[in-house]
UniProtKB/Swiss-Prot annotation:
Keyword Cell division: no
Xref: Pfam families: Tcp11 (PF05794)
Gene expressing this chain: Tcp11l2
UniProt protein name: T-complex protein 11-like protein 2
Region described as Disordered: 1-59
Amino acid sequence: MPFNGEKQYVNEDQQSDSESSRFSESTASLSDYGCSRQSFTSDSSSKSSSPASTSPPRGIMFDDVMAAAKNLSDMTLAHEIAVNENFQLRPNALPENSLAGQVKRVVHQAFWDVLEADLSAEPPQYEYAIKLFEEIREILLSFLTPGGNRLHSQICEVLDIDLIRQQAEHSAVDIQGLANYVISTMGKICAPVRDEDIRELKATTNIVEMLRQIFRVLDLMRMDMTNFVIRNIRPHIQHHLVEYERNKFQEVLEETPNALSQTTEWLKESIDKELFSETDVAPGAEHSSTPSLSPLTVLNNCYLKLLQWDYQKNVLPETLMTDGPRLQELTEKLNQLKMIACVSLITNNMVGAVTEGLPELANRLKRISAVLLEGMSKQTFNLKEALNSIGVQTCAEVNKALKERGSPTLNAEVQANLVGQFTSLEEKDNPVCALMDKRIQLYMKSLLCLPSTQKSRPPVPGGLDVIQQELEVLGCQYANIVNLNKQVYGPFYANIFRKLLFRDEAMGKIDASLPTN
């Protein structure tokens, strides 16, 4: 069957489909997937040319904007399917109390009320019912593979709209019989996850409610089929992702001027910082016409800045838009891990001697910190209050462990000092946070500098042992995002570096520093 463990769809003269089942309407629905389109067109027309562009800015036509948005949408969807193994379409339910949701419910209810009145009239009016069966027929046929097969012919024969209209003229339409046939056919081609829905349909006695639920289940079946198509095309997209995404982004650049303005500024800030640090190290050194800094080092520093990015206030570089949600989630998790490491370091420094040899206690304190710091990225989160609670809980757990060993508990002064140091972690320039942040950055940087042939991970810096497992997982995710981004956008970065570093000099050496494969 097409679905992994799911029922097979119906194929040529059979009651089942092969693994290569393709549905015309399913692929069309993929274009509905929403994605971010900001920063490519919003500011480009009002800004002067960036250093990466030598041609004067031109006006942006509406068609250019729409074409760029379409390319960006396609590129984002392909990227999401390729890198997110869990990506799938889900029902788009409107909020229950929203205006749009209320309007939709009222309009739909009005339609079904009219249908019920028509079918209850004497004689019955079948016009709306016929239109529904016509739509149902098209949906069922869209689930089948192209070409003639027995089920295709059967659906067309049973749901022959012209014949049904002739029967309606003589008030001889068997609405219940048609609905039962539709439900039976749906049961043959649906995924196992819809079996319960089919059973509920068969148990429905009211014909109008039955038709209403048929459309609900058909919508779910279309979504199932689309997700099946996504799963099947994922390996193909992954294989061609770098070339496809690069070509799509090139089309965006051709449609919109200065479409790399944010990316150029992102790279320029790191270049300026590196050049400034070189000047600080050797203030008397003779100025060289050729910058000595490595473009790859600058690019890695740019990627490291993303781990401290303010995703609420700052717009991401255009070349990283497709990975924005993943980078934001990764950064939020990393901040939580950093705080857990800070709490653990303070605990070990203050009461490590009395808790030595109690690994269960360390794990329990880590779980307490993780739970109380859950959601710390939200603006409504009270970090100081959470840290205070962690301090109180830590003191209680340590005292409990000490009592079990027959040792004296922590005195009030030590407990107050411990809680106070915990709450001070929310201060901007806290030295413990700065130290942990520096070590995490060092570890992440070492991941980016690993040779492609090296399989082993770099060692985790001291003080991060408590979060080593989680840090390695996040580090692997981060390195995968960065390495794919380098492969796709390496040529664009190289071009920007040429113009920022060498201006009018035709320097081709930079290409060797930026891997594009």
